Amino acid sequence: MATLLLSASVLTAWGQEAEATDGGQTEMAPTTSFTVWANEMQTIARNNTTLKAMYQQLKANQLANAADNALPDPEAEVAYMFGSPKGVEPRTNVTVTQQLDWGVLTGRRRKLSLAANTAAVAEYRVAYQAVMAEADAALVQMVYYNRLCSELENRCREARDIMQMFEKKYNDGDANLIELNKVKLNTSMSEAELQRAKADRAALAQTLQRLNGGTPLAMPHTTYPATTTLPPLATLKEALPHTAGVAQAEASLEQSTAAVKLAKVEGMPQFTVGFQGEYIKDNNYSGPSIGLTIPLWGNTRRKVKAARATQVASQLSLVAARQQQQSTLNQLYFQATQLNATAQQLKTHLDATTNDTLLRRSLEAGQLSVLNYLLEQSFYYSARTALLEAERDAQLAVSQVRALMY
């Protein structure tokens, strides 16, 4: 099995797998290196219960694949037969036989075992990719909710300040009850929105805890990683042959090819060698024996035909996997590029047209009514929320591109 390692220029690395071959068995240590969310992703990769179960299943499959790499056990038979009628001497027959498996003798069965090990590793990697992709997206969402909660906390503080200001004005006779009720309602709505965002963040924290094997995962970040900029599309395309989906299809083709070669070898007449002895009083007969199967009914031809059909299906699956990965990458890359541009454009416009300080001053100076202030403030807050969502969507799109490379 080739070591699976993606270039460091491709957002994230699959990592190096330690291999040791012993009688056709390959062991893999699921160690991984990341360039994004390094600490969190390594912790999840180490603690995730699904990956632990899949890794144990991988080792079980490797042991099972190596179980048929030796010749079948020899057979021994001893028969003691009494003479009849009375006076006939008893006879003892001894038979020892060994079946010769051409698949074992030619090494074809061992090669199939190694190919099956590679396929098992590829299956594990597909499961690994799915877990890491889910974790990556969940971490992006957690940053979004941290940013959203921080934004909503600022809005709540602003709403409370305005409410306190109007309570004072109301007590001084400078504001009426309608205006006071409006700012109180605005404060209640701000607090409710914050509590809803915190509830969503708590639910997402449970998802991260599940991915982390039941252990809570601290994720206080409010900024996205600086390494989430998309690399050139050509660089990503160079890494496509190493992705989990393509690797699994290639391993399946390798396994089916090895199965065809084994089926051809097993089509040869199967030999059995041994020793036979017949022992009677004063008369002993013994010597070597040999037997063979006669491929008369066409079972072997049907097995070879079936193996070839599986091989053709694997070839088509590999072509489909490569095309699918290529199409998926192009689609996700275009989507990520467009969403990044949209988020950046919105941020630029919002930074250039910020009116929050001016609105507060106008309200305090009495140049703006409470209703107009709340409407203008709501419009500005909607734009801020749209920016947070646009940045999140852009980061999720980059996360999907990154997930292809796990």
Which residue ranges define each predicted feature?
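Acidic, low-complexity, intrinsically disordered peripheral segments
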Residues: M1-S7, A13-P30, A38, P216, ...
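Bacterial Sec-pathway N-terminal export signals of envelope proteins
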Residues: A13-E75, Y80, L100, R108, ...
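Periplasmic alpha-helical coiled-coil/stalk elements that build and connect Gram-negative outer-membrane
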Residues: D22, A130-H242, L332-Q335, L339, ...
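Small/polar-residue-enriched beta-strand and adjacent coil segments characteristic
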Residues: F34-W37, P74-A127, A247-A320
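Amphipathic alpha-helical coiled-coil segments
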Residues: M41, A53-D68, A127, V131-N154, ...
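Outer-membrane beta-barrel domain signature
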Residues: G87-V88, T92, A192-Q195, A199, ...
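Short, charged, amphipathic alpha-helical segments
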Residues: K111-L114, L177-N186, V370-S378
